[in-house]
């Protein structure tokens, strides 16, 4: 994957400089060495994701594209935590998570198992719990996936959450479900291949999808 205006070394320097600015500490050299070990794997995961998104140029990563940089920080944090799990690795992953929150306004913890391919339209206000996420997920601003009394949703493949939507609690969201703007799905299931709208008296209106909207977002 081509890194626009960067090499792997300079991208690492850039990331470490941001971490040092926001979360200064005395372990800069050790942090850089740790991130350097995991950067190639994180970039490989990022490349696979970018190549599947229709609106992005395949084979290149632009660090000034805030949505792409948001994914980069998640993949790097998750890779560091997943591959090591030591106290020092947790510290590095935590700083990357907090940097992502500071720069992009997203609450995406490094322990969350995001799918291999997902797209963030606008990251501001997105809050994601430790739920089960299917591949080809689409998230827009102020969308939420959360637990209710400790129970997290299960999302199938090809789920789209438009702005200000939410999936909360004991939900099984069928594949290719689109949750419309401002709609909250709370302790409810959806059949899949459908559009979900806010109805009256807290009920949902569910309509069959005329075509797979997910095709607008991804290359299959």
Could you tell me what each predicted segment is?
Residues 60, 64, 125, 147, ...:
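Conserved short-loop catalytic and cofactor-binding motifs
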Residues 67, 128, 150:
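A short glycine-/small-residue-rich loop at the edge of a beta-strand within enzyme catalytic domains
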Residues 73, 77, 118-123:
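Short, flexible active-site loops
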Residues 106, 112-118, 124-126, 131-132, ...:
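A structural motif detector for beta-strand N-caps
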